[in-house]
C-alpha cells in the first residue's frame, strides 16, 4: 500500500507540474496566432481553465461567444459551466438565472439536463447553508415531496434532491449536537447520489461527484470505510481527466479535490492494507 501511495503522489505531482509548464501569457500569444475556429476554441478553453479570479469569467464569456458563433455544443457547455460557477458562488442570482436560461436554450440532451440540474442544485444548497426560515423550508419540502414519487424523476433530479437533503442534514449536524440517526440519514442521502450517478456516463455525472465523495469520507464510520470512499473518489477524478473531452484540458482538474482524495486515502492507508 505504501508503494501504491508513493505512485499516487508522483501522479499528483505530475498534475501540478503540467499546470506550471504553461502560463496564461503563452496561451494568449497562441490565441493571437490561431487561425482555425477549432484551435481558438481549444486555446480559449485552456486559458479559461488556467485563469484565476475575475479572469475566469472574462475568458469564459469570450469562449461562450466564439462557441455560439461556431455552434459548438461542447464548448458552449464548458463556457456556461464556468460562467455559472462564478455567478452562483458570488450570489449574483439574476445573472446566474439569465445564464441558466441560456443553458436551457443552447444545450441539448444530457449536457443540458446535467448542467442545469447541477447549477440549480448548487443554488438550492446555498439557500440551505446561508438562509433560514421560509426560503430554506421551501427548498427542503420541495425535495422531500419530489422523492415521494421517485419514478417521476430523472436521475439528475434524484441526485439533486438527495444531495440537497444530505447537505441540509450535514448543516444541522454542524449547528447542533450530532444525533446518531441524523448522521446515518445524511450518509444515506449521499450514498443515494452515488447510486444514481453510477447509472449515468461519467462525462455528465461528474459535477455531482467530488463533493459527494468528500462528504462521504467525512461521514465514514471507520478508516477502512474512509479508504474505500477515498479510492473511489480518486478513481473518479482520474477517470474523468482521462475521458476524450478532458484530455485536451490539462488545467481543468480541480487540485483541491485531487488533494482531498489523496489526503483521505493517505490517512486510511493502514486500514485498507
Regions found by a protein language model. Give the residues of each.
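Positively charged n-region of N-terminal signal peptides that target proteins for export
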Residues: 1-4
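A "functional boundary" signal
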Residues: 20-273
Amino acid at each position: 500500500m505504501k508503494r501504491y501511495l508513493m505512485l499516487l503522489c508522483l501522479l499528483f505531482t505530475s498534475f501540478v507540474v503540467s499546470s506550471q509548464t504553461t502560463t496564461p501569457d503563452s496561451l494568449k500569444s497562441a490565441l493571437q496566432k490561431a487561425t482555425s475556429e477549432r484551435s481558438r476554441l481549444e486555446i480559449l478553453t485552456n486559458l479559461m481553465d488556467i485563469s484565476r479570479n475575475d479572469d475566469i469569467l472574462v475568458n469564459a464569456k469570450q469562449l461562450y461567444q466564439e462557441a455560439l458563433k461556431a455552434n459548438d455544443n461542447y464548448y458552449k457547455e464548458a463556457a456556461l459551466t464556468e460562467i455559472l460557477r462564478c455567478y452562483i458562488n458570488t450570489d449574483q442570482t439574476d445573472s446566474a438565472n439569465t445564464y441558466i436560461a441560456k443553458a436551457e436554450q443552447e444545450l441539448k440532451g444530457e449536457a443540458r439536463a446535467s448542467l442545469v440540474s447541477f447549477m440549480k442544485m448548487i443554488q438550492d444548497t446555498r439557500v440551505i447553508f446561508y438562509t433560514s426560515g421560509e426560503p430554506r423550508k421551501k427548498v427542503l419540502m420541495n425535495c422531500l415531496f419530489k422523492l415521494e414519487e421517485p419514478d417521476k424523476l430523472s436521475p439528475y433530479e434524484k441526485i439533486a434532491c438527495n444531495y440537497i437533503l444530505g447537505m441540509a442534514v450535514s448543516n444541522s449536524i454542524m449547528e447542533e449536537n450530532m444525533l446518531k440517526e441524523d448522521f446515518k440519514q445524511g450518509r444515506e442521502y449521499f450514498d443515494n447520489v452515488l447510486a444514481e450517478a453510477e447509472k449515468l456516463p461519467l462525462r455528465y455525472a461528474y459535477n455531482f461527484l467530488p463533493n459527494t465523495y468528500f462528504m462521504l469520507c467525512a461521514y465514514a464510520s471507520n478508516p477502512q470505510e474512509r479508504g474505500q470512499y477515498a479510492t473511489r473518489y480518486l478513481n473518479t477524478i482520474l477517470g474523468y481527466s482521462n475521458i476524450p473531452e478532458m484530455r485536451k484540458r490539462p488545467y481543468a482538474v480541480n487540485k483541491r479535490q485531487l488533494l482531498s482524495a489523496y489526503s483521505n486515502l493517505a490517512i486510511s492507508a493502514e486500514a485498507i492494507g
